[in-house]
Amino acid sequence: MDYRRLKDLPEELLPRERLFQYGADALSNREILAILLRTGVKGENVLDFSERLLTETGGLSGLARLTVHELTRYRGMGTAKAAELKAALELGRRSVSSDPLVRPVINSPQDIAHLVMEEMRYLDREHFRVVSLSTKNHVLGISSISVGSLNSSLVHPRECFKEAIRRNSNAIILLHNHPSGDPTPSSEDIDVTRRLSDGGQILGIEVLDHVIIGDNRYISLKERGIL
């Protein structure tokens, strides 16, 4: 049916044709989403559908946070379309992960935030991780320690330092996200940081920092003078 097509638009304005001609960088978020969705719904062509979906979900960041089930609550989003969109968003999230053959160098809190921001800012639960570093501050690995509210009873020093010891690392960075988007440290965050810092001194593994990831924001406890 006609409402499912963009037949009234000149061919050079169609999202897919624009991608072929100018490249993906030239497309708006609405146009890229329209290519993924492929078809509109009754009364809306696919560009209008895409615009509405971005508006109702709060933009790309809001869209990325939704589960498949939550996506299907929006008009025009069936289970197949929701699953395809979620898979595309997940693929994009994974693509920002660094090439495992290239070890990033961490010289500042900004470096570690840049490394993990696009993945961790969208997580809907707290994930606590430990970054193991070489003597020249190359990332040797990032270990997942716990999922859920950060609590000193759940974060045992043994688990935090195990991978660092295995990798012969002499320094680590603590890392976790706040799903609320606000990276302000809680009293529990501070307690865990100090406890692990004390444990690191005993083991000879320095805790360089604890970086908390929010929604495109971060806080370094080192920069705050807490560590």
Curated annotation (Swiss-Prot):
CDD domains: MPN_DUF2466 (cd08071). Signal peptide: none annotated. InterPro entries: MPN, RadC_JAB, RuvA_2-like, UPF0758, UPF0758_CS, UPF0758_N. The lineage of its organism: Bacteria, Bacillati, Bacillota, Clostridia, Eubacteriales. This is UPF0758 protein DSY3180. PANTHER family: DNA REPAIR PROTEIN RADC (PTHR30471), UPF0758 PROTEIN YEES-RELATED (PTHR30471:SF3). Keywords: Hydrolase, Metal-binding, Metalloprotease, Protease, Zinc. Belongs to the UPF0758 family. Residues 105-227 form the MPN domain. GO terms for molecular function: metal ion binding; metallopeptidase activity. One of its GO terms (biological process) is proteolysis. The keyword Zinc applies. Zn(2+) binds at residues 176, 178, 189. A motif (JAMM motif) lies at residues 176-189. It holds the Pfam family UPF0758_N. It comes from Desulfitobacterium hafniense (strain Y51).
